[in-house]
Amino acid sequence: VEYCAAGSNNGTLERISNVTFANINKNSTATTGYEDFTATVGNVTPGQSYNFSASHTGTTYSSDQVIVWIDYNKDGDFEDAGEQVLITGKKMSPWTGSIAIPVTAPAGQTTMRVRLHDSSTLFSPNATPCGNSGYGQVEDYTLNIGELAVSDVKKNNISIYPNPATDVINVSNVSSKTKFEIYSVGGQLVNQGT
């Protein structure tokens, strides 16, 4: 799926240094008007809410604002009802909020777009998912809704089943000194051991 171009005309001031959402904790150099971080995948579950934070370590202004969109129906745009999922207050860094994933969100991978822009009418604001703003930055991420983005373990004939599981999993073909970690669909560590 190809999305509309977005960015800023001036990437030297208001920029994004970090985005934290679900299991995403992505630092960036914040040097361009657009960064493609779709190789970074966040795992979310329908019906759950997740804290969101974007920040910049440099200069920010009281008119700066972050807006987030998720292409829930995977149609290549962020224009459908409910796809603008967060609009922060106008303030200096950090910009925070909570994003609720609808129970009806289809499972699978889609794109999340994050825009930081200066909302002042003096600096060509752009509160839409497409096009450029005068100042700011846009970053795209991949979200995996409803299932972990992890392929079946094949190395050394290790077998984990059933997948998905609700309360019991079986692991076979491992030595008694094997370390393990189990993560929820939301990316939280729920169990670990040897």
Regions found by a protein language model. Give the residues of each.
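A broad "non-catalytic interaction surface" signal
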Residues: 1-147
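C-terminal outer-membrane/trafficking sorting elements
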Residues: 149-194
